[in-house]
Each structure stands twice: as structure tokens, then as C-alpha cells.
Curated annotation (Swiss-Prot):
It comes from Macaca mulatta. A motif (FFAT) lies at residues 206-212, 207-212. This is StAR-related lipid transfer protein 3. Belongs to the STARD3 family. It is found in: Late endosome membrane.
């Protein structure tokens, strides 16, 4: 397949709006459903990175305690040494104050960052300042250096641990939690803003909006349509999951300035990554295609079962259930990757399809379905929020932008670097096969 010339690729990019600019215009008409926002009890829960910090603070106390106990366990016995260290305390020769200093850090940091869950650095600034000043004075004035290896070891270890805690909080905990809070507030703002142009997503596709259905109405929201139909509790859960995935995909598209470049290829395809709160690292493929958006919509979104005919990264795709006009359950089997080091995986996803004025969107997330229980033949992967987005060009209807958002857990004991390499390679391979398919359809026409 011949690749796009560089000038044509640049022209395509100039003629197509950026994802973020689109997200700030018409996509704002799609208000985020309230289930995008974590429930209050989840918002109050301590974050994973803060929990790790608290564990490290606990390790600080336990490690200093262990070293002190080893120092006490000499020929004269622990009990006698404890009397000398505590009852007959001497600043110049005792290690007891270093243990008390570790307990001071432990109690202060856990009170501030585990119990009160403070978002400021002042508590650790106090504990680190007190620890550093005390240890420096003790090393200068005491006679610990005459007590052998422990005279060097305990002050140094205590000093290093105190500053490691400072680094961890300042460079890991607070920035990551601030980023999660920014995402949460952005989602809240989108919910409060409400629909500006038209409510709900329209489904006008041939496969999912029959003439007699309610999905073709411009004046009816998804909730009103659902109210006119009878859904089971499980079907309502599928619909909720699909809407949640769509809301997260909209947020990712609106955060294009925060996408981190990973790699590109000679065809102009680019892979980015972004850390999504509560879902982790997400891969994003962005490519420009010399064809109408409707063509990609038909081939990739409306006809997933036929994708196996041209997409070599997928070996099977089956629609298990059509819940309603916008929502369906699919079963997919991926081909192996990384030269066979990553074996085929199977996935059960709920998909939500929306047709908007500026784009076509198919978003999905992992779910469970009785028609496809776990099997020994494949390792069952689990997809986070993601999907396909086909962006229309406002100035040139013969070109479009294709975005694939992929958040997946392949399960199994696979090295992280191997997973990341295989996902990026799979995305490039998919883009290659998609271009081939477009060329074949163009030749037939």
C-alpha cells in the first residue's frame, strides 16, 4: 500500500480540527452523566499513591525500631541496655531519641496525611526540618561515632528516610492527587453546564436506528427513550456502563493538550498515552484518513462483525446482544502479539454507539455476559473505557481524523514494557489494515 505523501498528510492535518477544539465546541452539548463522577464514598477513600506513602512512613518506623533493637541486643542483654538508653538517658550516647524521632515522624505524617488527609506539604516540612536539625546536632555533639557501625548507621538511615518521605509526597502524592482532582472538577463542570445544542446522542445508523424506533427523534433524550421501553435490571446496567464509557472518552478527547507523545510511524500515525484517574494508563492512536468519515463509520463502528475480514489484529468478533438502539454487547478475540510472546486474548465489552454532528463515536468497557463465560482456551482480558472516534472535517468532507482510545488489562504475568510495546504495535498494525481496507473500497468504487 502506498503511503500518503508528506504534503498531503500536512494538508489533511490543516483541514481537520484538533480533537480538543472539537471537544470544546459541539461535544460540550453532550453533558456528562452523573455516573462518570465517582460516588461520594469513593471520593472520600484514600488514594493508592497516598496509601503507598503511608506504608513507607510505617516502614520508616519499623526499620529504625529494628536497627535499634539489634543495637540493644548485646552481651549485656536487652533489658539492661533499655534501662541505660531510656531510664539513664544520655543525649551523647543514647539511640533512644532517634527511635522517638522516627515515632514523631510516623505519628505526625499519618495524622496529617492518613487521618486528616491534608493536601498541603506543611506537615512533612515540619517533620523533615525537625528530623534534619536534630540529627545534625546529635551527630556533632554526641559520642555515637565511638560506638561502632551503629553510631554511623542509625543517624544516616533516619536522615535518608526522612528526605525520601519528603520527595515521595512532594513529587508523587500531591501532584497525582491534584491531577485526579482536576479531572473530577472538569467532569463536575461538564455536568453542571448541561446540554447546549441538543440533548442526548442521536443514533441514525442503519443498524441501530430503525424507522419506528425513538432514537431518530431530535427532541427525545436517552432517558425518555428508555422510559418508553421495558429493560431488565441487567440491561439498564449495560446502558449505564456504556454511558459511563462514553463520558470518560469525551473527557480524554477534551484533554488532548495532556496527551503524552509515545511514537509515530512513516504513515503519520501517532500513538499517545494519558493517565486516566481510576483507570490508569490509556493509549491513543490518532491518524488522518483520505476518505469520508461515513466510510470509516460503516466499516469500523457499524459493522464490527465484518472487521475480521480485513483487520488482522482481531480473529473473531460476535454481537452477543443488542440491548437498545445505541447499546450492544460484543465478544472479541485478539490475535497474538509481540512475535507470539503475548498470546490471544478474548474480551466481552459493552459498546455504546453515538452519531453526533461533528463525529461518530463507539465507546466501550469490559462487562460480563452469560453467553460467554470464562474459558480455558483464552485468557480473558479486561478493557477499561475506550473506543473509536471518527471526527468529521468542517472544511473537507472527503477526509477525516480517526482516533482509537485503548485502555486494557491483558491479564497474565506479562512484563509492563512488553505490554506497552505490543499495544503500540497493534495500534499501528490496525491503522495499516484500515488504510488497506479504504484503498480496496475506493478501487471498487
Amino acid at each position: 500500500m502506498s503511503k500518503l505523501p508528506g504534503e498531503l498528510a500536512r494538508d489533511l492535518e490543516c483541514s481537520l480540527p484538533a480533537v480538543a477544539s472539537l471537544g470544546s465546541s459541539l461535544s460540550h452539548s453532550q453533558s456528562l452523566s452523573s455516573h462518570l463522577l465517582p460516588p461520594p464514598e469513593k471520593r472520600r477513600a484514600i488514594s493508592d499513591v497516598r496509601r503507598t506513602f503511608c506504608l513507607f512512613v510505617t516502614f520508616d518506623l519499623l526499620f529504625i525500631s529494628l536497627l535499634w533493637i539489634i543495637e540493644l541486643n548485646t552481651n549485656t542483654g536487652i533489658r539492661k541496655n533499655l534501662e541505660q538508653e531510656i531510664i539513664q538517658y544520655n543525649f551523647k550516647t543514647s539511640f533512644f531519641d532517634i527511635f522517638v524521632l522516627a515515632f514523631f515522624r510516623f505519628s505526625g505524617l499519618l495524622l496529617g496525611y492518613a487521618v486528616l488527609r491534608l493536601q498541603h506539604w506543611w506537615v512533612i516540612a515540619v517533620t523533615t526540618l525537625v528530623s534534619s536539625a536534630f540529627l545534625i546536632v546529635k551527630v556533632i555533639l554526641s559520642e555515637l561515632l565511638s560506638k561502632g557501625a551503629f553510631g554511623y548507621l542509625l543517624p544516616i538511615v533516619s536522615f535518608v528516610l526522612a528526605w525520601l518521605e519528603t520527595w515521595f509526597l512532594d513529587f508523587k502524592v500531591l501532584p497525582q492527587e491534584a491531577e485526579e482532582e482536576r479531572w473530577y472538577l472538569a467532569a463536575q463542570a461538564a455536568v453542571a453546564r448541561g446540554p447546549l445544542l441538543f440533548s442526548g446522542a442521536l443514533s441514525e445508523g442503519q443498524f441501530y436506528s430503525p424507522p419506528e424506533s425513538f432514537a431518530g427523534s431530535d427532541n427525545e433524550s436517552d432517558e425518555e427513550v428508555a422510559g418508553k421501553k421495558s429493560f431488565s435490571a441487567q440491561e439498564r446496567e449495560y446502558i449505564r456502563q456504556g454511558k459511563e464509557a462514553t463520558a470518560v472518552v469525551d473527557q480524554i478527547l477534551a484533554q488532548e493538550e495532556n496527551w503524552k507523545f509515545e511514537k509515530n510511524n512513516e504513515y503519520g500515525d501517532t500513538v499517545y498515552t494519558i493517565e486516566v484517574p481510576f483507570h490508569g494508563k490509556t493509549f491513543i492512536l490518532k491518524t488522518f484518513l483520505p476518505c469520508p468519515a461515513e466510510l470509516v463509520y460503516q466499516e469500523v463502528i457499524l459493522q464490527p462483525e465484518r472487521m475480521v475480514l480485513w483487520n488482522k489484529t482481531v480473529t473473531a468478533c460476535q454481537i452477543l446482544q443488542r440491548v437498545e438502539d445505541n447499546t450492544l454487547i460484543s465478544y472479541d478475540v485478539s490475535a497474538g502479539a509481540a512475535g507470539g510472546m503475548v498470546s490471544p486474548r478474548d474480551f466481552v465489552n459493552v459498546r455504546r454507539i453515538e452519531r453526533r454532528r461533528d463525529r461518530y463515536l463507539s465507546s466501550g468497557i469490559a462487562t460480563a455476559h452469560s453467553a460467554k463465560p470464562l474459558t480455558h482456551k483464552y485468557v480473558r482480558g479486561e478493557n477499561g473505557p475506550g473506543g473509536f472516534v471518527v471526527l468529521k472535517s468542517a472544511s473537507n468532507p472527503c477526509v477525516c481524523t480517526f482516533v482509537w482510545i485503548l485502555n486494557t488489562d491483558l491479564k497474565g504475568r506479562l512484563p509492563r514494557y512488553l505490554i506497552h510495546q505490543s499495544l503500540a504495535a497493534t495500534m499501528f498494525e490496525f491503522a495499516f489494515h484500515l488504510r488497506q481496507r479504504i484503498s480496496e473500497l475506493g478501487a471498487r468504487a
